[in-house]
């Protein structure tokens, strides 16, 4: 069910209400990172007469929802789609620096310390918003895996694979089962082509839990009683753990892809939390935003980086500050868009509210444009299986734009259609659940009867064990006695038949 963000009813000085990471929505999850109602000016509604009688008021005070960070997330997810749409060169370096880190920064920025005393709610939010969508959608594509080769959506031919000519292959039962286990127990094993971005679910899930655990541990020490002190300690832990991993080439045991993304995500969450504690966004001016934008541009030219799973120490150093700078600069720009109710603002807010679906399904949506590209260039249908797009010929600006529109638009279109029929779907689900419960009830009754019969038999055996044992022994004795007598009689008959006297 949707967990709609509610406007806060407290004053601007109160603690803002938050919606945690991946709050559950239609289909199982809402947007990727947390969205929060940011403090705004209190708007007083003047009293007015109702039909000319009395002085009743509609409301005394009202606070509007700030959509600035929703638009920040929208820009980030658009850049995620753009990075997979076939771009290259400087633009690719530019978007890879900040597009995914922004979601970790948002998660840390809106972390509420109330969860230190309510860890269960925090964990359940993450399970419902990150783990469950990951498992459900990964298993869905796993079920369709072999069929996708028949349809040509996936191909075993190297020229129709990824940029390194890597390809996937159909699974046998053992391979399929192993992938299922990896999905459920390790948040890995997903389809590397159609679900290639699903590592984000695991990274944010693990980073969020690690952030909470470390925060609770630090709070037990009086030195970290203040949020700022704890935030700096969390940042130090994240940075040191990441550097330890990269400098020594370590791998976090049991964590898919080694854990670099999870530790880097922890560092970004701590940085976002500190930005909130120091009220950087509330005091943000062009004097801060412009240098941040310059740092991002310089980094994209001189030392580009990304959240690749095999990141080195230089990659970590190159991405950390520029990504934070990008978050600040984009948030500064979005506050101007947030001032007026325009088409651009409404579009970005809608995209920002559905980032999880775009993140999960944009590569699948690319296949529609890939089919169009295959038709235009007269390529074999198997070329649709190229990951993430048709790689040869390379995409020009037109194809990049089409991939971008499809990657963002088609998941939104699908969700719009789903929301129109979700009432009927819910009714069908309720009926299905009712039938399952009824069947389960009959099954339990049958099992109960069988269990009662089994217990009655066991009781009878226990109570009559002596009698039954004696009867069984007598029966066995009679059986062997009969065999003995039969053998004896047979021998007698043979001896009688061969008697010399008769001869």
Predicted regions and their residues:
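Alpha-helical transmembrane segments and their immediate juxtamembrane cytosolic regions
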Residues: 44-503
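Intrinsically disordered, low-complexity cytosolic terminal tails
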Residues: 2-50
């Amino acid at each position: 069910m949707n967990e709609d963000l509610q406007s806060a009813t407290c004053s601007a000085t109160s603690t803002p209400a938050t919606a945690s990471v991946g709050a559950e929505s239609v289909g199982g999850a809402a947007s990727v990172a947390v969205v929060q109602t940011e403090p705004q000016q209190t708007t007083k509604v003047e009293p007015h007469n109702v039909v000319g009688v009395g002085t009743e008021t509609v409301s005394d005070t009202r606070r509007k929802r700030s959509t600035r960070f929703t638009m920040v997330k929208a820009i980030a997810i658009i850049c995620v789609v753009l990075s997979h749409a076939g771009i290259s060169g400087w633009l690719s370096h530019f978007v890879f620096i900040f597009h995914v880190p922004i979601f970790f920064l948002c998660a840390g920025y809106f972390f509420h310390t109330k969860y230190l005393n309510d860890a269960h709610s925090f964990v359940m939010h993450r399970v419902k918003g990150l783990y469950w969508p990951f498992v459900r959608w990964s298993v869905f594509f796993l079920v369709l895996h072999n069929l996708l080769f028949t349809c040509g959506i996936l191909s075993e031919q190297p020229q129709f694979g990824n940029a390194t000519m890597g390809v996937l292959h159909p699974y046998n039962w053992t391979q399929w089962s192993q992938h299922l286990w990896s999905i459920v127990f390790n948040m890995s094993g997903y389809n590397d082509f159609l679900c290639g971005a699903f590592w984000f679910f695991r990274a944010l899930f693990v980073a969020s839990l690690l952030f909470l655990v470390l925060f609770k541990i630090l709070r037990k020490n009086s030195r970290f009683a203040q949020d700022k002190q704890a935030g700096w300690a969390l940042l130090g832990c994240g940075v040191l753990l990441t550097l330890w991993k990269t400098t020594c080439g370590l791998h976090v045991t049991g964590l898919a892809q080694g854990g670099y993304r999870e530790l880097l995500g922890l560092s970004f969450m701590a940085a976002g939390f500190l930005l909130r504690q120091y009220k950087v966004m509330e005091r943000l001016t062009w004097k801060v935003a412009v240098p941040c934008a310059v740092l991002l541009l310089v980094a994209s030219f001189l030392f580009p980086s990304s959240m690749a799973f095999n990141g080195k120490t230089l990659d970590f150093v190159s991405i950390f500050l520029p990504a934070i700078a990008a978050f600040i600069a984009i948030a500064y720009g979005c506050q101007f868009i947030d001032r007026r109710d325009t088409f651009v603002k409404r579009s970005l807010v809608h995209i920002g509210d559905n980032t999880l679906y775009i993140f999960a399904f944009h590569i699948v949506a690319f296949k529609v444009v890939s089919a169009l590209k295959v038709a235009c260039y007269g390529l074999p249908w198997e070329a649709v299986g190229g990951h993430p797009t048709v790689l040869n010929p390379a995409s020009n600006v037109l194809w990049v734009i089409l991939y971008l529109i499809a990657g963002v638009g088609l998941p939104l279109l699908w969700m719009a259609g789903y929301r129109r029929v979700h009432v009927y779907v819910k009714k069908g689900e309720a009926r299905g659940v009712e039938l399952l419960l009824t069947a389960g009830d009959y099954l339990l009754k049958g099992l109960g009867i069988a269990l009662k019969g089994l217990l009655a038999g066991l009781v009878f055996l226990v109570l009559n064990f002596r009698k039954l044992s004696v009867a069984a022994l007598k029966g066995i004795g009679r059986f062997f006695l009969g065999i003995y007598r039969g053998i004896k009689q047979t021998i007698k008959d043979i001896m009688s038949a061969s008697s010399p006297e008769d001869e």
